[in-house]
Curated annotation (Swiss-Prot):
Role: Formation of pseudouridine at positions 38, 39 and 40 in the anticodon stem and loop of transfer RNAs.
Xref: InterPro entries: PsdUridine_synth_cat_dom_sf (IPR020103), PsdUridine_synth_TruA (IPR001406), PsdUridine_synth_TruA_a/b_dom (IPR020097), PsdUridine_synth_TruA_C (IPR020095), TruA/RsuA/RluB/E/F_N (IPR020094)
Protein's UniProt name: tRNA pseudouridine synthase A
Biological processes annotated in GO: tRNA pseudouridine synthesis
Gene3D superfamilies hit by this protein: Pseudouridine synthase I, catalytic domain, C-terminal subdomain, Pseudouridine synthase I, catalytic domain, N-terminal subdomain
Signal peptide: none
Length: 295
């Protein structure tokens, strides 16, 4: 229906902006952003768009630049096109050209002033920890398997709530960031246990480079009582980046969604990624953690 060959259009054909709700399984990608020696989500998506609209160079802009191995359930992307494809037809047209690890949930027309990144008022991430004794093959690509002790999610929740508001979170920023500052507004936090799964969500106006994975490493240390709350708070409040060493693995992290002042997509355009495999409910319970060391 949409041939790959170039379509001759009138010179006056207007440029249109299209917004996409995109999911991807990030295991085999170097992240969202193009890299010279690796395959990125951006590269694959731009190549698929270019097949359908070859009249102009395509640049896909995302709400969040996820790292290598990180997944997305509700990444938001925009690009500009000048071809004849109606906005509502972009999703099926792209899905016919994309690998199974990238799916476009919905496509909508947007004004030229709307920007997937700059117009976003928040991003929300979820980190999933599998805290069961036995390994679970079907959870491996989506979670961090921590099975040494039963994690204390209560103390983890207390630590998370202390981050709410406008904060300087330099302690959770990896080296190599190009941000001018490390301030961000943490808008909402949530931690929930369902059997052996622990799901931690954090919503903020923006995220620092490597922030969520470094934070999750500290939270797990708290939950295992290898770290106490006083030390955790001192590290981030006093910007002791050198003491924040352990980063959680990428596969447990998922960009749930980006939010805007108005609803861009229909309710079905967002998908709350929730693992629904057998959680090993009959496994014997893990031992509780010992008391944290004082410092």
């Amino acid at each position: 229906m949409f041939p790959n060959s170039k379509v001759e259009l009138p010179k006056s054909t207007p440029v249109r902006r299209i917004g996409l709700s995109v999911q991807y399984e990030g295991s085999n990608f170097c992240g969202w952003q193009r890299q010279p020696q690796a395959v990125s989500v951006q590269q694959v998506l731009e190549e698929a768009i270019s097949q359908l609209d070859p009249q102009r160079p395509i640049q896909a802009v995302a709400a969040g630049r996820t790292d290598a191995g990180v997944h997305a359930a509700g990444q938001v992307v925009h690009f500009d096109c000048c071809g004849p494809i109606p906005a509502e037809r972009w999703a099926p047209a792209l899905n016919g050209r994309l690998p199974n690890t990238i799916r476009v949930r919905e496509a909508v027309a947007r004004p030229a002033s709307w920007h997937a990144c700059h117009s976003a008022t928040y991003r929300r991430y979820r980190y999933t920890i599998y805290n069961g004794r036995r390994p679970n093959l079907f959870l491996t690509p989506w979670s961090w398997h921590r099975y040494h002790v039963r994690l204390d999610e209560t103390v983890m929740q207390v630590a998370l709530e202390g981050l709410l508001g406008l904060q300087d979170l330099s302690a959770f920023q990896r080296t190599g960031s190009r941000r001018a500052h490390a301030r961000t507004t943490v808008q909402d936090v949530k931690i929930e246990r369902q059997g052996d799964l622990i799901m931690i969500e954090i919503q903020a106006s923006g995220f620092l480079y490597g922030m969520v994975r470094l934070l999750m490493g500290q939270l797990v240390a708290l939950g295992e009582h290898r770290l106490n709350l006083q030390t955790f708070e001192r590290r981030w409040k006093e910007k002791r980046r050198q003491e924040v060493k352990e980063a959680a693995p990428a596969q447990g992290l998922c960009l749930l969604r980006a939010g805007y002042e108005e609803d861009i997509f229909s309710k079905g355009g967002w998908y709350d990624c929730q693992p629904r495999y057998s959680l090993g409910a009959n496994d014997p319970p893990l031992d509780p953690p010992s008391a944290p060391e004082s410092s």
